[in-house]
């Protein structure tokens, strides 16, 4: 559903997409209370996968900040992506509290109503496709200053040129980035889902492993937030490359983690890498291909990322069953991360579209100047 949702996002904005995703996911979570057959469980998770916030539905939360901000895009993504880690820090222990007090079946229902109760009203009240829809400008720029400078002046400074999805798929960077993120995801998932049981099999205290897991989520938030704050001073490619290397080093540390401290710091570094990469994926597509058709472009890429990455966990599990060791799968994951890093490094910014470029500064002057309204107030909602 990624390409479909991406096009809807560019055309209509995130409001109803996010509301629909929240309601459908919430109803599926309630349905989990009543499942008793395997086909019911598979069906519910398939539906959640089609619209869920960790899949195509996540476009509705990652694309809008890139449309509302250009100069301050990194900072906006820093704040928005940090919310993912904050949610993990809050809801993982809260879920355990619900399970201990009400059983896991009732916990699904409680979490469903909490999610819908937060997401639906906030989406209806505050989400708008892009600032021009409200007569505003990205980054809170003043309309009068832009109009006084004239279109030519805008074309020479502060310009962001946007590619269409059809133009983007003809470029080399589109596919090297797609390959880099897909292979990285494959490498990550050979490790991420198996490291917890592996650490416990090595005799590490489960309570200490859970502590390190929680700290992993904290470090992911720190990584995404720090990357967003630094991206105006450090090129995005360097920040992104550091994420690949952090994940590879953390994976090597995990292979040798037979004591608490090495396990703890491997989880911390892994979290930093995950958070930095999470920011990088949200930022780099807008930097390379502009904001106008970002939903459509990322909608094409996301199913590929999810499909290839999804092979990692079952493949690693199969290797463990065959060999009795996690090491072969994990070393393969490290190699995949390094290959992905090379692909990312060779993915250069494609520059301007060659055929019929869509030229867009941070300021869509035609839509604002012809609106017949004085929008000197400027700003971001």
Task: Describe the role of every protein-language-model region.
Residues 1-13, 223-235, 320-321:
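Helix-to-loop junctions at the C-terminal end of transmembrane segments
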Residues 23-36, 246-258:
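C-terminal ends and interior cores of transmembrane alpha-helices
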Residues 28, 39-56, 182, 262-276:
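Hydrophobic core of transmembrane alpha-helices in multi-pass small-molecule transporters
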Residues 46-82, 290:
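Cytoplasmic helix-loop-helix junction between adjacent transmembrane helices
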Residues 80, 84-134:
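Helix-loop-helix hairpin linking two adjacent transmembrane segments in secondary transporters
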Residues 108-125, 328-346:
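Symmetry-related core transmembrane helices of the 12-TM Major Facilitator Superfamily/SLC fold
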Residues 166-224:
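Extracytoplasmic gate region of multi-pass secondary transporters
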Residues 188, 204, 208, 213-284:
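C-terminal transmembrane helical hairpin of 12-TM major facilitator-type secondary transporters
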């Amino acid at each position: 559903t990624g390409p479909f949702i991406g096009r809807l996002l560019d055309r209509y904005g995130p409001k109803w997409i996010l509301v629909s995703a929240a309601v459908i996911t919430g109803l599926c979570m309630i349905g989990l209370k009543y499942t008793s057959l395997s086909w019911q469980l598979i069906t519910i998770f398939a539906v959640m996968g089609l619209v869920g916030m960790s899949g195509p539905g996540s476009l509705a939360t990652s694309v809008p900040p890139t449309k509302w901000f250009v100069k301050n895009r990194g900072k906006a993504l820093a704040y928005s992506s940090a919310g993912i880690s904050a949610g993990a820090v809050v809801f993982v222990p809260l879920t355990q509290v619900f399970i201990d007090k009400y059983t896991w079946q009732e916990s699904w229902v409680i979490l469903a109503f909490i999610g819908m109760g937060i997401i639906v009203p906030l989406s209806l009240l505050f989400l708008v496709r892009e600032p021009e829809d409200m007569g505003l400008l990205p980054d809170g720029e003043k309309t009068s200053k832009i109009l006084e400078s004239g279109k030519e002046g805008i074309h020479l400074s502060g310009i962001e040129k946007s590619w269409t999805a059809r133009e983007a798929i003809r470029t080399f960077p589109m596919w090297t980035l797609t390959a880099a993120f897909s292979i990285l995801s494959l490498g990550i998932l050979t490790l991420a889902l198996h490291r917890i049981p592996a650490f416990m099999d090595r005799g590490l205290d489960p309570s200490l492993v859970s502590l390190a897991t929680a700290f992993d989520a904290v470090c992911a938030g720190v990584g995404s937030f720090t990357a967003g704050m630094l991206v105006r001073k450090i090129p995005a490619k360097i920040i992104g490359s550091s994420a690949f290397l952090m994940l590879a080093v953390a994976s090597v540390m995990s292979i040798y983690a037979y004591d608490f401290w090495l396990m703890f710091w491997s989880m911390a570094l892994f979290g930093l890498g995950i958070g930095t990469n999470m920011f990088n994926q949200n930022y780099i597509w807008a930097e390379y291909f502009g904001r106008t058709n970002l939903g459509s472009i990322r909608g094409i890429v996301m199913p590929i990322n999810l499909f290839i990455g999804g092979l990692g966990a079952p493949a690693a599990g199969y290797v463990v069953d065959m060999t009795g060791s996690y090491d072969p799968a994990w070393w393969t994951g490290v190699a995949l991360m390094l290959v992905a890093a090379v692909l990312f490094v060779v993915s250069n910014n494609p520059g301007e579209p060659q055929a019929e470029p869509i030229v867009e500064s941070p300021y869509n002057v035609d839509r604002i100047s012809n609106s017949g309204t004085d929008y000197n107030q400027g700003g971001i909602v």
